[in-house]
């Protein structure tokens, strides 16, 4: 890469201050609003059954393009985009009646041999840990926003206030990094819950650390590949983001073994929220009462690896706290929650109340931690670079709110998903209530994140992103998200799930 252009690229993403949380909320609200319109079309018209070309294009226009437009063409008017999506949904909602059936797509009937070899209770007994469409949609929407932002940020059409803040401030991309980790924590709860349901003896800590290392190795290898690619291609890099050598793949790769250590502590302190708060409170105390903050932010970089990568090393504590908070939420919302005395409706109401209360609690903690609310707040600014306490609280509050909104939409438009007594019927209703594209994004999220990074690198090496017109930028970005969507759908159609 030409040295002068590389310097321009690095300056383009450096020394930024972020934007307002209210604007970030308006932009990210586009995802639930798009799902609102999708849900009305599906619940009232069974629009996406069968899933033909028109359904595919509409799905793409509803669940992918609005997020791209919210961060580019409508970045200065996100509420306008929200209204444009909500208005047809409300009109259709009040001028049509619910579809008489949500069972147009029947699962294939098992063969006689399969029936004979299948225990009677196998297909009739519902899963204790069912698939939740709202959770699939939440994770997929987060992945779409992440994939959009990592390339769009290199174009001028993407506002600088949405790019990562240098030291202090809130931005869309700052939120996206934390949300990626939070959502990983949410789904990690499934393995914990399976272990509890199996009633088998839990493996020892060293065995679990060895197993977690096997999950870490591919991510650490990807981190090394990215490191050598960036250095070898003389690619523009933002050193103060994670450090000289560190990158996000290293953060993701180191999470599993450290999470296992804190999972062992959960036997003593049976609350992942308390463990999370314990980590971030101690970290924040260290930042405020020692020279750690100035060491991370302004100290000259020494020759040792810690000094060169101090942002990545110390911010890891904040991301670990975020992951544990996500796991705590997953433990609450993933189980079926029904019993002889508790109906599916009551179980869903309990989940909504839990998410609502969690949103309120985390938001309150964030307000008192990051502002001078009522003269009692600490007034500590948010820093993604430090992954400090206000950042952890903000990410936790936001993701709980998003989960609440997606859960509310599912409960409103598809209330009968988990009322089926048989597994086949429940799977059919779950499929009916979930966008095919969102299912595909959720199924291979980490693999798609890797594909998005590779495509971003290819575009930046072949297109002068700082100098292209708005029209050219949008053509590139639409083609980019279409390619990622195509990869996601192809993997899903082939029933391939790449576990990294």
Curated annotation (Swiss-Prot):
Indicate the principal place this protein occupies in or around the cell: endoplasmic reticulum
According to the record, the residues making up region (Disordered) are 100-128
- The residues that carry sugar chains are 369
Question: What Pfam families does the entry give?
Answer: GWT1 (PF06423)
EC numbers on record: 2.3.-.-
InterPro entries registered for this protein in UniProt: PIGW/GWT1 (IPR009447)
Source organism superkingdom? Eukaryota
Q: What does this protein do?
A: Probable acetyltransferase, which acetylates the inositol ring of phosphatidylinositol during biosynthesis of GPI-anchor.
Q: Which GO terms describe its cellular component?
A: endoplasmic reticulum membrane
Gene Ontology biological process: GPI anchor biosynthetic process; protein localization to plasma membrane
Q: What class of enzyme is it?
A: transferase
Q: What membrane topology is annotated for this entry?
A: Multi-pass membrane protein
Residues passing through the membrane, by range = 21-41, 47-67, 74-94, 133-153, 168-188, 249-269, 272-292, 311-331, 351-368, 389-409, 446-466, 471-491
Identify its protein family.
Answer: Belongs to the PIGW family.
* Protein name, per record: GPI-anchored wall transfer protein 1
Pathway per the UniProt entry: Glycolipid biosynthesis; glycosylphosphatidylinositol-anchor biosynthesis
Q: Which GO terms describe its molecular function?
A: glucosaminyl-phosphatidylinositol O-acyltransferase activity
Q: Which species is this record about?
A: Aspergillus oryzae (strain ATCC 42149 / RIB 40) (Yellow koji mold)
Cite the entry's keywords alphabetically.
Answer: Acyltransferase, Endoplasmic reticulum, Glycoprotein, GPI-anchor biosynthesis, Membrane, Transferase, Transmembrane, Transmembrane helix
Subcellular localization(s) per the UniProt record: Endoplasmic reticulum membrane
